[in-house]
Amino acid sequence: MSNDKIINAYPDIRLMYLSLIGMVLCVSLTAQQTLSLGRNNYNQDKGIIFQKESGVNARIYTNGFSFGYQLGKIKKYNLSQYYFAEFGELKDPIESRQQKNISLSGPRGTFRGFIFGKQNNFYPLRVGVGEKRFLSEKGKRKGLAVGVSYEGGPTLGLLKPYYLILRHTSDNPGNFTSIRSERYSDENAPRFLNWDDIFGADKLTKGLDELGIVPGINIKGSLHFDWGAYGEFIRSAEIGLMADAFIRDVPILADNDILGINNNQNIFLNFFVNLRLGKRK
């Protein structure tokens, strides 16, 4: 090949190289922009990484239950940080529901079961922040990922008076008997804590206009099992230990030395199981 032909071929070769470099740059810029937007961020080893996740929780613990919501940000493929809020009921460990087979003609009919000695229902509203770390990896879309979760924050405890339907016997001749709905007090303690005078519990909404407040804090730690750790949909379960601490004793049961009821406390420890469903995006 002559020198003239070789020299004349250089522009074509340079043009090919420039075109190839331009194509590579375009693909690189497009990929970088796509990753920066958090889309198609797929790693062969770590799975699909999203930016945010949200879900609902159903938690059962030793002495109560709660329902909640989580909203979080995915920091890394194995690390998420989130905010949470949950509302439920916290019971005294020695509570026992009882039932009397009593029925009356009229609007009341059969009476509801009751908890002997109960003074208040206690409903904690827990909020706070948490973190979830995965300790194991799984296949791209299948398998089980195991991790740990820990969270904590303030608690607003709501006390609702517990009402019983009590029997009142008149001192007049004929011993006329009436029934009344009453909450616990020092004055009616002998009747409130007398099995024979109790017909049953009043409706659950009774006392909602008499709520009291007990502030506190909450912390939880758990093992986390996720069947969709790197997928779009969240299906996970947790088992762990939770603690609630309040600024004063919570009067769930009526203190009574005669009956041996002196169990009110300000710190509650519970084992729990939590189920969570949600979505990542």
Which residue stretches match the model-derived regions?
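Residues that define the transmembrane beta-barrel architecture of outer-membrane proteins
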Residues: F50-S54, Y61-F65, L79-Q81, N121-L125, ...
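Transmembrane beta-strands of outer-membrane beta-barrel pores
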Residues: I60-G64, K73, F87-P93, E131-L135, ...
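Outer-membrane beta-barrel translocator/channel fold
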Residues: E86-R126, G130-R141
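Outer-membrane beta-barrel transmembrane domain signature
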Residues: E151-E238, M242-N264, L277, K281
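Cleavable N-terminal export/targeting peptides
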Residues: M1-G47, K281
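Membrane-embedded beta-strand positions of outer-membrane beta-barrel proteins
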Residues: V56-A58, Y69, Y83-F87, V127, ...
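Short glycine/proline- and aromatic-enriched beta-strand/turn motifs that initiate or cap beta-hairpins
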Residues: Q32-F87
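Short loop/turn motifs that connect adjacent beta-strands in outer-membrane beta-barrel proteins
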Residues: K46-K52, I74-Q81, D92, Q119-N120, ...
